[in-house]
Design a protein with these regions (language model features):
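Catalytic-domain carbohydrate-binding cleft regions of carbohydrate-active enzymes
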Residues: 1-187
Length: 187
């Protein structure tokens, strides 16, 4: 990893001014360009951009941020709580994560039915799913193994039933979520 001050020194001036003042503002300009381009082609369609880069103010371009390709460990799930709070405190109301983590440990990929690793994989995904149901965007995504609930746990199992419950709860919360989204946009 390169020192941040060295990276800033390597950057040339930006359209807005010196790179040291506007470092990382690329995300805002990128979101604006995509938004304006989509609106110019299809002015009556809603634009939605999901990006891993973030900068204050990008929400005005219908942009949501996700925390990137994170690992599949308990500490990775824990880190998403502070990541979400940081997004929100930065004025970015729409954020998400790869529920269950993106980069899966080999022990989970190779787990056999009845193994401790498979039990832990299911528990981790279940807890992450429960947390994700209350986040602004509910998105289960990642590398193999597949993330559909029927691929994580057998139908009828406690893990499956829990994940199904939180999926249904999320849909029950949609009027509330849409109302908050509208309030965020208009107020």
């Amino acid at each position: 990893n390169t020192d941040i001050e060295y990276r800033k020194a390597l950057c040339g001036p930006t359209y807005l001014g010196p790179s040291t003042k506007y470092f990382n503002a690329y995300a805002l300009a990128n979101a604006e360009a995509i938004y304006d381009g989509q609106r110019s082609v299809n002015p009556d369609d809603r634009v939605f951009l999901l990006t891993r880069s973030g900068f204050a103010g990008q929400q005005r371009y219908s942009t949501a941020t996700w925390s990137g390709d994170i690992g599949t460990r308990w500490e990775d799930m824990k880190a998403q709580i502070s990541a979400g709070l940081n997004f929100a405190m930065s004025g970015i109301p729409y954020w998400t994560m790869d529920i269950g983590g993106f980069s899966v440990e080999n022990r989970y990929m190779a787990a056999k039915e009845g193994s401790e690793d498979l039990r832990e994989w299911r528990e981790l995904n279940n807890r992450w799913y429960q947390f994700g149901a209350f986040c602004p965007l509910f998105r289960s995504h990642g590398q193999y193994p597949c993330r559909e609930i029927y691929n994580i746990a057998p139908e009828g199992s406690p893990t499956y039933q829990s994940m199904k419950y939180y999926t249904e709860l999320r849909y029950q919360l949609m009027p509330y979520i849409y109302s908050l989204a509208s309030k965020t946009h208009f107020e």
